[in-house]
């Protein structure tokens, strides 16, 4: 018995059979059983890209500690100076992921050091505000800025400088308060406060009136949406479209130009419900919740609002516009919110209720109001409600893969329309709705990097049986889901090679299955642009990672690729606004949104190139100036075309203008040097007050602490903060002396011409005219530092400046007396901006 126990406890020698791992599907095969392509890739249609690499797990078993040492050497250098003061490796020890087939697989530790990218080098960014707690998705603007040291420094400099200036000038103006606007908007009303209508400066007065009208409009948006509904019937008495207007005009427009963007209705059934609703409304002027009239009413209101957007942004004459002008539709969304979210409707769900939620999701995306918010995440909770409602009703992958398994039992009022809607019709509606919900879930992943809420995907061939454009796109879903898993399963170690490969597969298949019908051109345009936007954000994440791991060759390839993508997308926006229009103009309200998302990303990423340009020895002031002018052209295009109508576009213009003025420096003023020295100077000032732990700069840029300590060891006459940054903080900075970035100057030319020089340019107008006029009051204040407005005006630069005059006595950025740090930094700001540049933002 003892012998048997010893034998049982002894290690059994097993045959060593090395395995290989398919890089597509991660299927692991033994050497004698290997088949190329593997069965998974044959099923998924990825035969051409199937190849194997040896599983590092086998190498470990064969070589023991030697392999461990080699793997450790391959791991990227640890990134120090996180917000929590600790250091963490980019590559984790071991992880497990779930493949699309549901198998649990061991992910190889590392294929090579540069294959893995850390999307959250500072950790996941969670913002706590009174109104909301938000964890930002990996590709939203806030996360991009948080990941990039240069953009983080720019944002930190901007916020500190704005705060200093507003504190100095606070009390110089009686702010007019609009309670409907958020806190960040209130001081913007400084432009509304004063001004003589008969002033000789008519241009300034024009700016004031335009700014005020925009503030009032956006304030009304928020006020109308938040209004408390007491009597719906009274609100709708004269403002509900008549039966003839809705059925003969609005619904016809919806079927002709909008329905393919929201293919979730069986139109004959909808018309039946609408006619029943109007029969009751015209007779009693009441809306019965018990009979679900309020659901049909919400559909009518949403379709009307969407058709208003369609006709408004088409910029074409339409008789519908005349009818819409007679209706007060401002309270429609508040009424819908009242019926959907204040009456416990979310405890159960009907088909009509689900369609309302989907229409509301579509409206929030397209509407010029707040909509999806600054980070495009405000509808994420609504999307979760939609998906939960789908699951409750049986709308899932099953209705597409095996629709024959469903049978429908109709009760009550549902039995009254069997001649209109049969069980087979219900199956078709289910399939269209699920395809549409899938599309939205995957689209927001591509735009924002946020994790898909629907965690399953299946290979699905719809050839010859497409019910809608969205149903056709389900063929792409399994690839998009692979991309989601690679990105979100382990954000700190994303396999960039595998992700790019799946992106290429998605683009290739999309080109094969895209519908060429004219009514679907705008849907193809949006999806193609969404894929390009995903690649843009991924390339920027790779760029910041390569800087940290000091991979010079890959960095040079990536930085050129990223710039080419920026230029390509900017040119696409330019053609969209100024080129020939091939798409249905009534779909422009829909495509405007993806273009605004792209333009906003461009306005965020171009400054990152301007700040890095000092590292490229072959690039000088002329190239930097061209980049700044390119930034000005993109901003002018974006804000003039969309800023008058879209709330979030208008709001982002203030920070974009400040960033532009920071970067638009004369030849002898390097903007990166100014930012770096300013932040170091602020750090020194706060260090004297012993408030390091509470300082924003320490939280955002902890690397500056070690940089300051290194600078203190260098004699003053050898002090060069930029050079030390390029060698210590970003060591790759001194390895690009001979690198030349191809700016694609021929593609930049359309942006170097100010198309709005003869008209009103809203991007130019902010600060440049208003601030110089409003600054007159600042002369009479008792602030700690008095501003000389005339000198500031003389030193202020023209927009898109080309030949700046060097300053004879440049300001010393490193003060000798710590007591004067506050005054010195304010003087620095005065030399860069007009006195009230900043007060308009906070």
UniProtKB/Swiss-Prot annotation:
Compartments, record wording: Cytoplasm; Nucleus; Mitochondrion
Keywords: Cytoplasm, DNA-binding, Metal-binding, Mitochondrion, Nucleus, Repressor, Transcription, Transcription regulation, Zinc
InterPro entries the UniProt entry points to: OAF3, Zn2-C6_fun-type_DNA-bd_sf, Zn2Cys6_DnaBD
GO BP field: positive regulation of transcription by RNA polymerase II
Known function: Transcriptional inhibitor with a significantly increased number of target genes in response to oleate.
Record has Cell cycle as a keyword: no
Region (Disordered): 55-101
Annotated PROSITE patterns: ZN2_CY6_FUNGAL_1 (PS00463), ZN2_CY6_FUNGAL_2 (PS50048)
Protein name: Oleate activated transcription factor 3
Protein family according to the UniProt entry: Belongs to the OAF3 family.
DNA-binding region(s) from the entry: 22-50
Organism: Zygosaccharomyces rouxii (strain ATCC 2623 / CBS 732 / NBRC 1130 / NCYC 568 / NRRL Y-229)
Positions with biased composition (Basic and acidic residues): 60-71
GO MF, any single term: DNA-binding transcription factor activity, RNA polymerase II-specific
GO cellular component terms attached to this protein's record: mitochondrion; nucleus
Presence of keyword Zinc: yes
Gene: OAF3
Bias type Low complexity, positions: 87-99
């Amino acid at each position: 018995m003892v012998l048997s126990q010893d034998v049982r406890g002894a290690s059994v020698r097993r045959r060593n059979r090395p395995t290989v791992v398919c890089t597509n599907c991660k299927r692991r095969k033994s050497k004698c059983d290997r088949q190329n392509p593997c069965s998974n890739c044959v099923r998924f249609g990825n035969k051409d890209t199937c190849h194997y690499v040896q599983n590092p797990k086998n190498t470990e078993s064969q070589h023991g500690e030697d392999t461990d040492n080699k793997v450790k050497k391959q791991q990227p250098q640890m990134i120090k100076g996180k917000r929590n003061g600790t250091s963490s490796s980019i590559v984790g020890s071991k992880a497990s992921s779930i493949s699309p087939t549901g198998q649990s697989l061991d992910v190889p530790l590392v294929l090579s050091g540069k294959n893995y990218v850390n999307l959250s080098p500072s950790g996941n960014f969670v913002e706590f505000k009174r109104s909301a707690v938000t964890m930002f998705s990996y590709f939203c603007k806030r996360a991009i800025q948080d990941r990039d040291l240069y953009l983080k420094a720019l944002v930190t400099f901007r916020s500190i400088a704005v705060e200093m200036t507003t504190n100095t000038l606070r009390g110089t103006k009686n702010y007019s308060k609009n309670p409907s606007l958020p806190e960040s908007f209130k001081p913007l009303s400084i432009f509304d406060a004063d001004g003589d209508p008969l002033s000789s400066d008519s241009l300034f007065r024009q700016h004031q009136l335009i700014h005020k009208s925009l503030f009032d409009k956006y304030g009304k948006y928020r006020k109308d949406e938040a209004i408390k509904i007491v009597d719906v019937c009274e609100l709708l008495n004269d403002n509900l479209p008549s039966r003839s207007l809705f059925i003969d005009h609005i619904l016809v427009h919806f079927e002709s130009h909008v329905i393919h963007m929201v293919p979730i209705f069986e139109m004959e059934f909808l018309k039946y419900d609408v006619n029943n609703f109007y029969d009751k409304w015209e007779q009693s002027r009441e809306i019965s919740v018990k009979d679900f009239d309020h659901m049909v009413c919400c559909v009518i209101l949403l379709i009307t609002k969407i058709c208003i957007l369609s006709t408004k942004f088409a910029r074409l004459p339409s008789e519908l516009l005349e009818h819409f002008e007679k209706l007060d539709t401002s309270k429609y969304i508040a009424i819908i919110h009242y019926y959907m979210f204040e009456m416990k409707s979310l405890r159960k769900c009907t088909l009509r209720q689900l369609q309302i939620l989907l229409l509301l999701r579509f409206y929030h995306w397209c509407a010029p109001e707040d909509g999806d918010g600054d980070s495009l995440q405000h509808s994420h909770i609504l999307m979760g409600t939609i998906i939960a409602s789908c699951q409750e009703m049986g709308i899932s992958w099953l209705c597409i893969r095996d629709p024959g398994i469903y049978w429908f039992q109709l009760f009550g009022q549902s039995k009254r329309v069997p001649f209109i809607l049969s069980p087979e019709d219900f199956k078709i509606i289910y399939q269209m709705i699920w395809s549409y919900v899938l599309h939205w879930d995957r689209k927001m992943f591509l735009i924002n990097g946020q994790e898909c809420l629907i965690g399953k995907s299946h290979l699905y061939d719809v050839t010859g049986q497409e019910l809608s454009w969205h149903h056709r796109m389900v063929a792409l879903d399994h690839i998009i889901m692979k991309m989601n898993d690679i990105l979100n399963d382990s954000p700190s170690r994303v396999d960039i090679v595998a992700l790019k490969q799946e992106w290429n597969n998605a683009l290739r298949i999309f080109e094969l299955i895209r519908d060429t019908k004219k009514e679907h051109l705008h849907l193809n345009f949006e999806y193609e642009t969404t894929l390009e936007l995903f690649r843009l954000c991924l390339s920027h994440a790779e760029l910041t990672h390569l800087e940290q791991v000091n991979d010079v060759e890959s960095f040079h390839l990536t930085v050129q690729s990223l710039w080419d993508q920026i230029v390509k997308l900017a040119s696409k926006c330019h053609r969209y606004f100024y080129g020939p229009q091939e798409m249905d103009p009534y779909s422009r309200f829909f495509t405007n949104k993806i273009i605004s998302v792209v333009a906003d990303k461009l306005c965020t990423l171009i400054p990152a190139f301007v700040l890095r340009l000092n590292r490229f020895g072959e690039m000088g002031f002329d190239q930097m100036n061209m980049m700044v002018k390119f930034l000005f052209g993109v901003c002018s295009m974006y804000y003039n075309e969309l800023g008058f109508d879209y709330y979030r576009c208008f709001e982002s213009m203030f920070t974009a203008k400040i960033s532009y003025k920071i970067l638009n420096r004369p030849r002898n003023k390097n903007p990166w040097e100014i930012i770096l020295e300013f932040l170091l100077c602020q750090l020194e000032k706060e260090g004297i007050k012993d408030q390091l732990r509470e300082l924003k700069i320490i939280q955002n840029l902890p690397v500056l602490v070690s940089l300051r300590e290194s600078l203190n060891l260098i004699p003053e006459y050898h002090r060069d903060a930029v050079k030390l940054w390029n060698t210590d903080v970003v060591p790759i900075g001194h390895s690009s002396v001979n690198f030349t970035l191809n700016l694609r100057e021929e593609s930049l030319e359309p942006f170097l011409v100010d198309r709005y020089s003869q008209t009103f340019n809203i991007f130019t107008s902010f600060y440049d005219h208003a601030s110089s006029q409003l600054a007159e009051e600042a002369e009479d204040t008792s602030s700690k530092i008095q501003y000389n407005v005339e000198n500031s005006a003389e030193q202020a630069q023209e927009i898109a400046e080309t030949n700046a005059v060097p300053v004879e006595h440049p300001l010393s950025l490193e003060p000798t007396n710590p007591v004067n740090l506050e005054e010195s930094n304010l003087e620095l700001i005065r030399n860069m901006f007009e006195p009230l540049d900043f007060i308009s933002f906070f």
